[in-house]
Amino acid sequence: MSVLQRRIDDRLNQLFNFKKVGDWYREGLCPQCGKKELFTHAETPRVVKCGRLNKCGYEEHVKEICEDLFKDWSKDFPRTPENPHAAADAYLVNARGFDVSKLKGTYTQELFRNDRKYPDLVTATVRFKLAEGVFWERFIDRPERFGRQKANFMGDYKGLAWSLDDLDKLCNTQSIWVTEGIFNAIALSLSGQPSIATMSTENYPEKMLKQIADRCHELGRQKPRIRWAFDNDKAGKKSIRKFHLRAVQNHWDSTAALPPSGGLDWNDLYMRDQLHSENRKAHKHYGELHIAETPEQAGLLIYNFNDGRRRTFYFNHNYRLYWFNLDMDKYSKELERIEADPDRDFLLDSQKRELALQQCSAVSEICNRQLTPLYFQRNEITDESWYYFQISTPDDEMKATFTADHISAPGKFGPRLLSVHVGAWWTGNNHQLLTFMKQNTERLREVKTIYFMVYTKEYGAYIFEN
């Protein structure tokens, strides 16, 4: 057990008071629900989870719990003549979850200093080569000392991309996932999905794509599909749409993938063992939904992804709320008509079903804003309560309060929405409003107000002004 592993082991047992059962730590005290249901692997702890999956669902990576232990890699793992990359190796294994035996030769351990900008500061780095004279390096020794700068570029990387996979492997795969960061690309490639990293959501990898296209031509192979897979944030989603359209214009078969909302990227999912092929099906769906050109196309994507289990549902598309409805009687008759049509015998069964779905499904807009319930707030003294919602458009977002009366009747919800956000219209009916509100408020977080600066027995805490 390394020095770092011993420190992690000590910290986890101090925090959660685990009992060791075989190769596992169990019966730890969950910080979220207070029950002794916490568990993790004793020898190689990665993720600490609560066993009450439905009632609690607490899950946190060891790197986040013991954040202060993952900062000074050169001190904990000094380089030696036998291993000049000791700190870089340790960082990639412990902070990124990678098997470095599969990365040998793709990185080096270097030093970064900039006496003009950061006097007397130096850090070890993990450096990757993008092209001759072009490098990217990640700071690994207390990077917070350098403010917002956590990495450094050398050379012009415009149009370039980095990949763990060689050119021929990229050409011989069915699809290539395009991420922003190198560690995300490594996570995908080690999970069996060839990928490249653009280094920035503003960098369209034109030179790399040309290399792939030229090599495919030499090999006599069809070009692989490009799947844009940036982070699930505003910058990432904006670039996915932009680069997808550009790739299509450049005659690439293009689509998209997105990690789930919540802030986790591909490397985070890899460390949580959530990047297998079955997991990636959902990620592909999220991406395809994001680039859907019309709400009708988005509705059909959702219907098919759920295997037709729901005939009516609401969904968001381009910051607007829509309602999908499938008339099953009409669908059955239309499918029979298509199957009986001799001019359509060449269609596959799945294509016939898709054609019938297109003819018999209906999508209508029920709100020209995206509505996200945030939390419920209650004042027990005055018996007042409010539901907080985030109201979003492509250009801005704001928070607003709604009462129980507002959210339970279209006649009250519509005027309230219009009064808090200019031009925001609710056009759905009573059933659609109640369906949306019920599904979004049943497990909503609750915030209780405290109006006095005093010790509260209920929460076991002192409340101060500052």
What are these regions (language model features)?
Residues 33, 92, 281-465:
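N-terminal nucleic-acid engagement/recognition segments and initiation subdomains in replication
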Residues 1-75, 82-130, 213, 290-295:
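N-terminal structured subdomain of primase-like DNA metabolism proteins
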Residues 5-12, 116-222:
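Phosphate-handling DNA/RNA-contact segment within nucleic-acid enzymes
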Residues 212, 238-250:
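Short, aromatic/basic amphipathic alpha-helical patches
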Residues 121-124, 210-215, 264-279:
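Short, surface-exposed amphipathic charged segments that create phosphate/polyanion-binding patches used
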Residues 201-205, 230-240, 261:
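Acidic, metal-coordinating catalytic cores used for nucleic-acid/nucleotide bond scission
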Residues 50, 92, 180, 188, ...:
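Terminal peptide-recognition signature
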Residues 178, 221-235:
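Acidic beta-strand-to-loop metal/phosphate-binding motif
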